[in-house]
Structures are given as C-alpha cells and as structure tokens.
Amino acid sequence: MLTYILDSSAYLRLIDREAGDGRVADIIEHHTQQRARVIISAIQWGEIVKIITSRGRNLTVAEIAHDLRTLGIAVIAATADRAERAALIGLKYKIAYADAFGVELAFDSPDHVLVTADYGVKPAEPDMKIEFLPTKPKQ
C-alpha cells in the first residue's frame, strides 16, 4: 500500500483551495477508503500550525488538528534519530531543515511518496518518489 507524506505546502494547498488541492483531496479520500496511507511529520505539522496562527484566520489550530484525527492522518514524531537523518539529508541535498523531515519520511520505504508544492526539495527527486503539486498561477 502506498504511503503519502504530505508536507506543509500540500496540506495548506488543500486548506487554502489553491492549485493542487483536488489532488490532495483525492489522496486523503484514498486514505479514508484504506487504499493508501497518509502521514505528516511533526515538524511539518508545526509549520502548518505556525502559518495558520499567523494568518489570524477563522480556521483554528484545534479545528485542523481535529480534522487530522478524524481522518486518521498520523503525525510522525521527530525523534532524535529522525532529526539526525533529516539534518544529513538537508546537507546532502541542500534543502531546508524542516523540508528534510518530509524527505526523511519518504526515504523510509520505496512505497512512500512525498507530496509537496515546494520545489526546493527537487534535488532529492532522483533518489526518492516525489509528487509535485502544480505551481500557483501568477497574480
């Protein structure tokens, strides 16, 4: 069974109804039908909380957390081992540390696919599966 790792950009595309939101919704639907699994790293979850809170939107962190729990999306802890691997991944591919946590999860298995709208992780693409969401249209 495929496991999709949503990074913060993918989840925010869904919340904000931006380019690629339909694909993220499809992935979550496959998860709820037990045809795929969806996970997110605790670090990426923290980014989502920070961004939503900073926007001052009507959508609260508690509501988003409730959605994750209701959908059964697992938040994977940032253990010391994962943090060390993410640091090395960040150095190897020259990607941001927080982004490296999603990449690190994708390296766990050949059945893992990172879903992102962040093209900064592109250097890791030759060594793992990454599904890039479309870029936002220019305004």
Language model regions located:
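Short acidic, glycine/proline-enriched helix-loop-strand junctions
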Residues: 64-68, 72-79, 83-84, 122-139
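Alpha-helix capping/helix-boundary segments
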Residues: 10-11, 44, 82, 102, ...
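Active-site neighborhoods of divalent-metal-dependent phosphate/nucleic-acid chemistry enzymes
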Residues: 73-113, 117
